[in-house]
Amino acid sequence: MAAVGRYSGKVVVVTGGSRGIGAAIVRAFVDSGAQVVFCDKDEAGGRAVEQELLGTVFIPGDVTQEGDLQTLISETVSRFGHLDCVVNNAGYHPPAQLPEETSAQGFRQLLEENLLGAYTLIKLALPHLRKSKGNIINISSLVGAIGQSQALTYVATKGAVTAMTKALALDESRYGVRVNCISPGNIWTPLWQELAAATSDPRATILEGTLAQPLGRMGQPAEVGAAAVFLASEATFCTGLELFMTGGAELGYGRKASSSTLVEVPILPP
């Protein structure tokens, strides 16, 4: 848990803050002394977090709607007078799909939620972040860097989030605004549970997800929250950084072909 006072007096906006990683980020910043304004489409979940955590303000909102994001920023600045950090967390991972099962319409919708919502919020927040020399934290994904089977559209959106982070870090450095991203691997969240439940063997899916990390466990949302507070408060010489929160899942060299892959095995000479 983040230490009290590490981000005291600061104002933070978080998207998708009603559950999972988003709720953990909200909690971590509150524990660090910040005032947190967060949005989510889930109004009941957002109100529950707001009631639980003193120092939070919930504003119902959909990141695919620019008007909702304008309200989020204007209400934050009107209430607190400044803005120090934006965390673009809202996003979605569709169930497993083969490439031929995806659609352009579904891809556009996912781009709106996972990429364009973050872009829009950043544009709206930048005038205020430049004044405070604040920072932006985008939640990307490990698979944006290494790929993932049956997740073509999701991987594309998250790879774009990481690329946008690096480009923006260059542009905003002249204003003293830092821009970083966190790329989680397997974090045990409600979304992970839902995706596992949709598979033919949820227990096997969960075990496979657990064994993907050399550390032998999935990460916890609170660990991502702690990383976000670190990037905002103490990582003052970091910009354009992609911080892997993965338990080492990307490390090592091993089997990649699936059981259905046509394999050509070398033959030893006699």
From Swiss-Prot:
GO terms for cellular component: cytosol. It is an enzyme of class 1 (oxidoreductase). Transmembrane segments: none annotated. Disulfide bonds: none annotated. Catalyzes the NAD(+)-dependent oxidation of L-fucose, yielding L-fucono-1,5-lactone, which rapidly converts spontaneously to L-fucone-1,4-lactone. Does not use NADPH. Displays low activity on L-fucose, D-arabinose and L-galactose compared with rabbit and human. This is consitent with the low L-fucose metabolism observed in this species. NAD(+) binds at R19, I21, D40, K41, D62, V63, N89, Y154, K158, I187, T189, L191. GO terms for biological process: L-fucose catabolic process; steroid catabolic process. Coiled coil: none annotated. GO terms for molecular function: D-threo-aldose 1-dehydrogenase activity; estradiol 17-beta-dehydrogenase [NAD(P)+] activity; identical protein binding. This is L-fucose dehydrogenase. Signal peptide: none annotated. Its EC number is 1.1.1.122. Optimum pH is 8.5 to 10.0. Keywords: Carbohydrate metabolism, Fucose metabolism, NAD, Oxidoreductase. It catalyses: L-fucose + NAD(+) = L-fucono-1,5-lactone + NADH + H(+); D-arabinose + NAD(+) = D-arabinono-1,5-lactone + NADH + H(+); L-galactose + NAD(+) = L-galactono-1,5-lactone + NADH + H(+). It comes from the Eukaryota. Belongs to the short-chain dehydrogenases/reductases (SDR) family.
